[in-house]
């Protein structure tokens, strides 16, 4: 038996062992004589976002009581809007209410309608089960998926137990999507996106929500993961144009210091937005993104640029930029309604100037036409009513995303914080040149921004008419994690000290800030470690609450 056969046999056994642990459930790997895990009630320790706290929460404040009344009054309005969707799907009222916030127990049905999940299920009966079974038998990234699932939303009550029900569903979704869309395969941030949908939707619905989110031209998320996509570069070019017009001093300073694209507020948005702000605000921004589409990305980054303008003009290279990224979080450490008010004003201003979307890409040499790009809404504030469903698997999709920049001469690659690389720009017709990120050993499943850490996450079945969120009786078990300020600064420090990168990965295990127990160590108390060496890359985890919790 040669080396290839031995390696294939080992991987097959490893894959079977991982699948078996999830099938056994959260008690997988424990000795039988330990008995059942003692039940613990979280009635007074779970906040309205589903995060488990070690101490009992204080009584409701007057402001929180006001939020209760507001949530109840909005619930009936959203129910009426869902009942007459054809009337409201393209109305201004839908956008107005999205900026005010969706009630928690309406969010699942509303996301389902916005992403056309029922239509996809009717067009593809039984397809999810087929993809899931194929993924179990042939997944090439199951170790990475298992590792990322173990660190996804671990402070949320739905994902608290290792190998629990929600973790098993999350594994199934990621395995099925890897098989369904081989162009994207698996990227680390997909686990957080899928976990977000699982908090509000059943397993199969969450899978089709992930498919629609990446496939639809309206949201353009596939361009952040596909090696053929151009979403990031198009938005980056448009951001430079908008900032140069509205804030020429800021843009001039960026050009003078030659700050790389990874260090732009767009990059900070991708890496920090969902980890460095309160969960409630993250949810509000996610609602707006699903309703508005990619047009919401530019106003969000523009707000951060405006708030941090003075600090940005004093920034240069990695060290100071790390401090800016840290302060970028403070942009969002404000009242949720205030942030959404400024976001709405920024959206209207950019829409009026037709700066909310990049221009269409020019046709490539030898092609007859370029990929169509959603048009800016001009002075109107209307939501597109026609949300196109993909005709089939992503293999038949048109070229996924545009690139707004004109043809340029080649440039040398520039290393950026966190291990990412600013991609070289080649003239039209030379797209076959290998990516610098791959040349330096970057993961093949991701693209320009190699680290999205998490996405918003919330419970699915809160009843606003019953006891308020703090005292709600959750019947499932799960969790949430967030990125500490030290971890936000770590990528830049490691970029300046490459020799310390591997050493820090082994010397600084992540800990649970509430319990003082490492995530990995706590999981090992519940289950036996996977046999064989781990061939996946290392990554640090942290679980401190972000500001505003």
From Swiss-Prot:
Compartments where found: Cell membrane
Membrane-topology annotation of the record: Lipid-anchor
InterPro entries: Rab-GAP-TBC_dom (IPR000195), Rab-GAP_TBC_sf (IPR035969), Rab_GAP_TBC_domain (IPR050302)
SUPFAM superfamilies named in the record: Ypt/Rab-GAP domain of gyp1p
Keyword Lipoprotein found: yes
Gene Ontology cellular component list: plasma membrane
Entry-linked PROSITE patterns: TBC_RABGAP
Family annotation (SMART domains): TBC
Post-translational modification comment from the UniProt entry: Ubiquitinated by a CUL7-based E3 ligase, which leads to proteasomal degradation. Palmitoylation is required for membrane localization and protects TBC1D3 from ubiquitination.
Keywords: Cell membrane, GTPase activation, Lipoprotein, Membrane, Palmitate, Ubl conjugation
MF annotations from Gene Ontology: GTPase activator activity
Pfam entry (one): RabGAP-TBC
Domain Rab-GAP TBC: from-to ranges: 101-293
Residues where lipid is bound covalently (S-palmitoyl cysteine): 318, 325
Biased composition (Low complexity): 398-417
Region of interest: Disordered: 350-419
Role according to the record: Acts as a GTPase activating protein for RAB5. Does not act on RAB4 or RAB11.
Other information: TBC1D3 is encoded by a collection of very similar paralogs with multiple copies of each paralog, some human genomes encoding well over 50 copies depending on ethnic origin of the donor.
Name of protein: TBC1 domain family member 3K
Organism: Homo sapiens
């Amino acid at each position: 038996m040669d080396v290839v056969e031995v390696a294939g046999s080992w991987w097959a056994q490893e894959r079977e062992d991982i699948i078996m642990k999830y099938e056994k459930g959260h008690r997988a790997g424990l000795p039988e004589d330990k008995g059942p895990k003692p039940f613990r009630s979280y009635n007074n320790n779970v906040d309205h976002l589903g995060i488990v706290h070690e101490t009992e929460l204080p009584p409701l404040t007057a402001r929180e009581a006001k939020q209760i009344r507001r949530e109840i009054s909005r619930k009936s309005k959203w129910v009426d809007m869902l009942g007459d969707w054809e009337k409201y799907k393209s109305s201004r009222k839908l956008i107005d209410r999205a900026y005010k916030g969706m009630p928690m127990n309406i969010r699942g049905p509303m996301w389902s309608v916005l992403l056309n999940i029922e239509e996809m299920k009717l067009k593809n009966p039984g397809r999810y089960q087929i993809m899931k079974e194929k993924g179990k038998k042939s997944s090439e990234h199951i170790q990475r998926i298992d590792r990322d699932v173990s660190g996804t939303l671990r402070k949320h009550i739905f994902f608290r137990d290792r190998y629990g029900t929600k973790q098993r569903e999350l594994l199934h979704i990621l395995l099925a999507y890897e098989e369904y869309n081989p162009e994207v395969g698996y990227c680390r941030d997909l686990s957080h996106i899928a976990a977000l949908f699982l908090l509000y939707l059943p397993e199969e619905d969450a899978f089709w929500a992930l498919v629609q989110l990446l496939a639809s031209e309206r949201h353009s998320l596939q361009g952040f993961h596909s090696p053929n996509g151009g979403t990031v570069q198009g938005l980056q070019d448009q951001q430079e144009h908008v900032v140069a017009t509205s804030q020429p001093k800021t843009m001039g300073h960026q050009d003078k210091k030659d700050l790389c694209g990874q260090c732009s507020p767009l990059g900070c948005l991708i890496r920090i937005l969902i980890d460095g702000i309160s969960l409630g605000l993250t949810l509000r921004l996610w609602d707006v993104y699903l309703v508005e589409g990619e047009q919401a990305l530019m106003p969000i980054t523009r707000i951060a640029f405006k708030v941090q303008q003075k600090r940005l003009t004093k920034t240069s290279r990695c060290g100071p930029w790390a401090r800016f990224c840290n302060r970028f979080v403070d942009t969002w450490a404000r009242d949720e309604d205030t942030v959404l008010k400024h976001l709405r004003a920024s959206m209207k201003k950019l829409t009026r100037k037709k700066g909310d979307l990049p221009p269409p890409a020019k046709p490539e040499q030898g092609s007859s036409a370029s990929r169509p790009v959603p048009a800016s809404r001009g002075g109107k504030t209307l939501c597109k009513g026609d949300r196109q469903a993909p005709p089939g698997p992503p293999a038949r999709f048109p070229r996924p995303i545009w690139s707004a920049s004109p043809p340029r001469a080649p440039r040398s690659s520039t290393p950026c914080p966190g291990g990412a690389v600013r991609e070289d720009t080649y003239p039209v017709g030379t797209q076959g040149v290998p990516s610098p990120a791959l040349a330096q050993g970057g993961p093949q499943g991701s693209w320009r921004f190699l680290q999205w850490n998490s996405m918003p996450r919330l419970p699915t079945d809160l009843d606003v008419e019953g006891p308020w969120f703090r005292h709600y009786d959750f019947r499932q078990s799960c969790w949430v994690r967030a990125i500490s300020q030290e971890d936000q600064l770590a990528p830049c420090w490691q970029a300046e000290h490459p020799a310390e990168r591997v050493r820090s990965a082994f010397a600084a295990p992540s800990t649970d800030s509430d319990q003082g127990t490492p995530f990995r160590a706590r999981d090992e108390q519940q289950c036996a470690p996977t046999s064989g060496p781990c061939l996946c890359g290392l990554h640090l985890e942290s679980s401190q609450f972000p500001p505003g919790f």
